[in-house]
A protein has these predicted regions:
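A glycine-rich helix N-cap at a beta->alpha junction
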Residues: 127-131
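Amphipathic alpha-helical segments at domain termini/boundaries
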Residues: 1-14, 24-63, 166-170, 211-262
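A solvent-exposed, charged loop/short amphipathic helix patch at secondary-structure junctions
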Residues: 58-75
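Hydrophobic, secondary-structure "cap" segments at the distal end of domains
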Residues: 199-214
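Alpha-helical scaffold segments in soluble metabolic enzymes
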Residues: 89, 136, 203, 229, ...
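Glycine-rich beta-to-alpha active-site loop
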Residues: 105-106, 110, 141-192, 218-219, ...
Length: 262
């Protein structure tokens, strides 16, 4: 789940999401799962030989429902539907891709996670199914790496918080820009009083090998961890100054391509 105060897919006629409306919530919006890269509002997908780039650039006014803006690259179900579509298209339409760079189109912000205002106005059923869907999308990224030979690199050009960092954790490698302010964070506990809802704590310990005591400290530190400390705690694989960031990502990408092709 996430951090910030603020979630796309164009609503077209389709199956209506189910959920009982309660006081303070809005009716579930009509959701269409039919999309393709030419219709994405929040992602850009490009393929160059064995390398693909997925850029998250969320349209603030592109939420599935009224009542919230998708600020700071936060996401709602519509954003994640596009991500799911892109991951599966890479597997089936571009099987020759060996490395996928997941990055942001916003300055100093990778992703602030699930949109809090969207969650606040949603029904309980919607929240549960939203978390399940986002989990399945991140599992799909890991499955593409394990079984389709497509490794993912999270190129964090800015802060990755809450569900934004959980998205990065689904990738094979994480590179964080070292600009003095960009951090990785799971601030759900100190800010919202809830546990991360998209596998963050499990992946920290089981996938990345973060020490449990450090994971506990990290999950109760609202401001997150920056720079070399993030690498020392195994929260990221490498940091790079902004001037060197593109070259470092290219190096990681080329190594992964060589490993997967070789």
């Amino acid at each position: 789940m996430s951090v910030t105060d603020e979630t796309q897919v164009a609503a077209t006629p389709g199956a209506e999401a189910q959920g009982t409306q309660t006081q303070g919530t809005q009716p579930a919006p009509v959701v269409s799962f039919g999309t393709e890269p030419g219709r994405y509002r929040h992602w850009r997908l490009s393929v160059d030989g064995p390398v693909a780039t997925l850029t998250l650039d969320v349209a603030e006014d592109g939420g599935l429902a009224d009542g919230y803006e998708l600020k700071m690259n936060s996401y709602d179900l519509g954003v994640d539907i596009e991500l799911y579509d892109a991951v599966q298209r890479l597997r089936f339409e571009h099987p020759g891709v060996r490395a996928v760079v997941l990055t942001s189109g916003k300055e100093r912000m990778f992703c602030a996670g699930a949109n809090i205002r969207m969650l606040a106005q949603a029904t309980h059923a919607w929240k549960v199914n939203f978390c399940k869907f986002t989990n399945e999308t991140r599992n799909g990224i890991e499955d593409a790496s394990a079984h389709s030979g497509q490794a993912y690199i999270a190129a964090l050009t800015g802060t990755a918080a809450g569900g934004g960092y959980e998205l990065a954790l689904a990738c094979d490698e994480i590179v964080l820009v070292d600009d003095g302010s960009s951090a990785v964070a799971l601030p759900e506990v100190p800010l919202l009083g809830v546990l991360p809802g998209t596998g963050g704590l499990t992946r920290l310990v089981d996938k990345r090998g973060v020490r449990r005591d450090l994971a506990d400290v990290f999950a109760t530190t609202a401001e997150g961890i920056r720079g070399e400390k993030a690498v020392a705690w195994r929260l990221a694989d490498e940091t790079a100054k902004a001037r060197d960031f593109a070259a470092v990502i290219e190096r990681h990408r080329d190594v992964l391509v060589a490993d997967r092709i070789g």
